[in-house]
Amino acid sequence: MTIGREKMKVEEILENARKAFKLTTKHFGNTVTFERALFLGWYCNLKQPCKFCYMATQKNKIKDPRKARRRLESVLAEAILMKRIGWKLEFISGGYGYTPKEINDIAEMVAYVQKCRQYLNVGVIDLDNINLDVIEGVVGAVETVSKDRDWICPGKPLDKIKDNLLKAKELGLKTGITIILGLGEKEEDIEKLLNLIEELDLNRITFYSLNPQKGTIYENKPSVTTIEYMNWVSSVRLNFPKIKIITGVWVDKIPMISPLIMSGSNVITKFPLFSVFGTKEAHWIEKEILATGRELLGTFTDIDILAGKKVLEKTPYIEEEINISSENIKRVEELRENINERIESYVSKVLRKIKAS
């Protein structure tokens, strides 16, 4: 492509971003929020894990998969802290290898401590054995729509993911997918994604920029550029004005945040919470969001809110009546002391990090 045509393409993307930003304001108002996936563990039981994934590099190092699971009090403590600082749970994830009952119990308890329904991203799940009263939606890990998808994600057949999402829709749940940019996708793949969104009637989509992991084939590969990322986000917004768009970037890509919001993103995700909260990077992230003219719900910098010394004034959380089994209520209450200890441990970790920085 000539320099002139490249310039025309960039100008087109920037113009589309401008239109997408206006559409986002029209349908979602002037706010941006933080979200974060709640991971249950570090082991993936897929026989053929994804080529890009950190868990794939750890699989052979983990002799006992159950020891790679997080303790329940740790999961619930993080859920409580996320509500405290106004970060919605993007979804409960990392559940490959869990039984439907285990997923159900965890979802019930997380919903109970947060007083709101949850999204699941735990692979193809048997929804008939899940308490749907605590589930807002189901997310499918599509990851990429490129021609190499079956090779990149051999353990995640697209047809099964689609069937699971369509069943969730029939049951009255919201649905979404995850897409990772930087896996070799082409611009023409955007049309494939738009067709998939329409086919599945999705309520939301999460984009991530590839964070190349050591030990994977992508270790030395470049990730997606800001302009490319903007093109994907604005294309989805212009074609689906009411879809929720979540965009994830790593700490080394903070300058991407403003352009992504200006391209139609509602939500920023992916940042490591406890190692970054209150640091200069966290202040920079908030500044990037506010620079777009958007209002930020939630905080990445207020230590007093994290520590529970004051209450967040503006939160994206809307409390709901949550009904779970008496058995799981009992489990939560029996763990209260341990949960509170984990909360204090997380807060102390943040304070030490800030003091050392």
Curated annotation (Swiss-Prot):
CDD domains linked to this entry: Radical_SAM
One annotated GO biological process: biotin biosynthetic process
TM segment ranges: none
Domain (Radical SAM core) ranges: 27-242
Pfam families in UniProt: Radical_SAM
Keywords, in A-Z order: 4Fe-4S, Iron, Iron-sulfur, Metal-binding, S-adenosyl-L-methionine
SMART domains: Elp3
Intrachain S-S bonds: none
Molecular-function GO terms, alphabetical: 2 iron, 2 sulfur cluster binding; 4 iron, 4 sulfur cluster binding; biotin synthase activity; metal ion binding
Keyword hit for ATP-binding: no
Binding site for [4Fe-4S] cluster: C44, C50, C53
Required cofactor(s): [4Fe-4S] cluster
Coiled coil: none
NCBIfam families associated with the record: PRK06267.1 (NF004911)
UniProt-recorded name of the protein: Uncharacterized protein MJ0597
Source taxonomy: Archaea, Methanobacteriati, Methanobacteriota, Methanomada group, Methanococci
